Amino acid sequence: MPGPECKWSTTETGAPCGTDDSSGRLAPVFVYGTLKTGQPNHRVLLDGAHGRAAFRGRAHTLEPYPLVIAGEHNIPRLLNLPGRGHRVFGEVYEVDERMLRFLDEFESCPDMYQRTRLHVALEGVRGPLECFVYTTATYPPEWVHLPYLDDYDSQGKHGLRYNPRENR
């Protein structure tokens, strides 16, 4: 059974599960892990049954964050510790409310990830862009000491193979 339904966040900090917004607007979402192009879960962004997701470009966080691979399934996690780690590379998608709700459920928000906001530099665009992102705020203390990545690849030289959901 899925956790509580997350809705559009309206606070400056992007507190998870804010108020609903049915305005039909598109929300920018920064993805840094298995949802990126060429990664194991990218297909869910392409599936129109979940809503609309339009690729806007490559980007990187303006602040450094610790991006680690953690847990028994080698899941990439962006720890919500701005100022530590590296500027993280990823992609920005503009998503409709239906896709955002799907992503909240897919990312087990708010139990496993929390939908927050951060600023990114989008390639070819001047000025920062505020995006939603799925970060991890609650985790075992040893995760802070794992190696920090700046650009996740499930087949990367780190040797930690992601275990897809369908194999768990």
From Swiss-Prot:
GO terms for biological process: modified amino acid catabolic process. Residues 1-20 are annotated as: Disordered. One of its GO terms (molecular function) is gamma-glutamylaminecyclotransferase activity. InterPro entries: AIG2-like_dom, GGACT, GGCT-like, GGCT-like_sf. It is an enzyme of class 4 (lyase). Disulfide bonds: none annotated. Its EC number is 4.3.2.8. Substrate binds at residues 32-35. Keywords: Lyase. One of its GO terms (cellular component) is cytosol. It catalyses: epsilon-(gamma-L-glutamyl)-L-lysine = 5-oxo-L-proline + L-lysine. The active site is at 107 (proton acceptor). Contributes to degradation of proteins cross-linked by transglutaminases by degrading the cross-link between a lysine and a glutamic acid residue. Catalyzes the formation of 5-oxo-L-proline from L-gamma-glutamyl-L-epsilon-lysine. Inactive with L-gamma-glutamyl-alpha-amino acid substrates such as L-gamma-glutamyl-L-alpha-cysteine and L-gamma-glutamyl-L-alpha-alanine. Belongs to the gamma-glutamylcyclotransferase family. Monomer. This is Gamma-glutamylaminecyclotransferase.
